[in-house]
Amino acid sequence: MKQKDSFYTFCLKFLLIFFVMVLIYEQFFPEKKILIQQDRLVYLPDQKKSVPLELEWVLLSEIPEEWIFYTVQVEDKRFYSHKGYSISDIHSSLISSVLFFRKIRGASTITQQLARTLFLSREKSFSRKWKEIQIASALEDELGKNTILEYYINSVYWGRGMNGLNQASRYYFKKKPTNLKFNQFKALIQILKKPDAYTREEVILLSKNL
């Protein structure tokens, strides 16, 4: 029993240290920057982290507000209130990883997903999660919510080798994004959690049931 109590105490201390590190980073590392330079998105603390911007771009202004609202509700309900990461989600992820000896879970905010898509691998580890939080925080500071949403919709992985709404809508529905029906757009958002789990036919069927 004592052994179990000491293990839980260790886990709680570990989580406390992690959150303190996040807060310290937020307060004392103002040099973190994400900038658009010419046609590239650059993460300044590491100049090697430079991402070309795609040409098949869909402006946020071209997407109906109802569709944007749906995206946020499905992918990240607290998107407009957090600073790029969710402490509660990080907490539950770390608890699961430490107590049950699992790899750290991939659940992330929209901003963290964008950080991972643009600058990081899909490896599930504490170090990658820490970098993800740093970059997400920088994205929030430099780009703002609407720009983050626009970048997210244009870069997120939609399965079958498709990145971004333009490629996804053309692959799954053979349409430009602006010609999609709302139920088709909803189907595309629904598959984002496990994009490679769906075939084109399954996505079309899903759209008919929404």
Model-derived segments and their meaning:
Residues M1-L210:
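Juxtamembrane regions of bacterial inner-membrane/periplasmic proteins
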